[in-house]
């Protein structure tokens, strides 16, 4: 009887061991596949929510541009200095992103990168101005008074604007107004 209990115990523990090993192998394969998928996906999603293009009822944007509320946005995948970014946008008949309201902040909220925006300090006006000369609205970035006037402004996914050296390289967003 003791031999039977020992044999039965070995059979049960062996079966459970094989099941555990199978589960661990399956878990390892699933984790490997999910990490591979996560590392590949960001390369194909450069920034803000591309679904916004479907909501654009009054504009037709060129290829690689995203439409949202009668504006087209180019979301760069390469990093440039602020001046290089500004010139590249101008060559596309657009300008660095100028945020008009919190809706555009929502448009940016799905991004996980830093982007140059078209905000710089005007020594002549002693104020932060958008590329078109309009003043920065204080409700967009409540802490804007702490920015260093010698720096340029990058936007981050948490809804904050940060001042960085204009020679640093960041991704950028160009905005083209259609109306």
UniProtKB/Swiss-Prot annotation:
Assigned keywords, A-Z: Adaptive immunity, Cell membrane, Disulfide bond, Glycoprotein, Immunity, Innate immunity, Lectin, Membrane, Receptor, Signal-anchor, Transmembrane, Transmembrane helix
List of glycosylated residues: 83, 132
Gene name of the record: KLRD1
PROSITE patterns named in the record: C_TYPE_LECTIN_2
Oxidoreductase recorded as keyword: no
Record's subcellular location: Cell membrane
CDD domains linked: CLECT_NK_receptors_like
One Pfam family per UniProt: Lectin_C
Residues covered by the C-type lectin domain: 68-175
Organism annotation: Pan troglodytes (Chimpanzee)
Residue spans, topological domain Cytoplasmic: 1-10
Superkingdom classification of source: Eukaryota
Membrane topology label: Single-pass type II membrane protein
Role description: Immune receptor involved in self-nonself discrimination. In complex with KLRC1 or KLRC2 on cytotoxic and regulatory lymphocyte subsets, recognizes non-classical major histocompatibility (MHC) class Ib molecule MHC-E loaded with self-peptides derived from the signal sequence of classical MHC class Ia and non-classical MHC class Ib molecules. Enables cytotoxic cells to monitor the expression of MHC class I molecules in healthy cells and to tolerate self. Primarily functions as a ligand binding subunit as it lacks the capacity to signal.
Identification of the protein by name: Natural killer cells antigen CD94
Tissue specificity as recorded in UniProt: Natural killer cells.
Biological processes, Gene Ontology terms: adaptive immune response; natural killer cell mediated immunity; negative regulation of natural killer cell mediated cytotoxicity; negative regulation of T cell mediated cytotoxicity; positive regulation of natural killer cell mediated cytotoxicity; stimulatory C-type lectin receptor signaling pathway
GO cellular component: external side of plasma membrane; plasma membrane; receptor complex
Disulfide bonds: 58-70, 61-72, 89-174, 152-166
Predominant localisation class: membrane
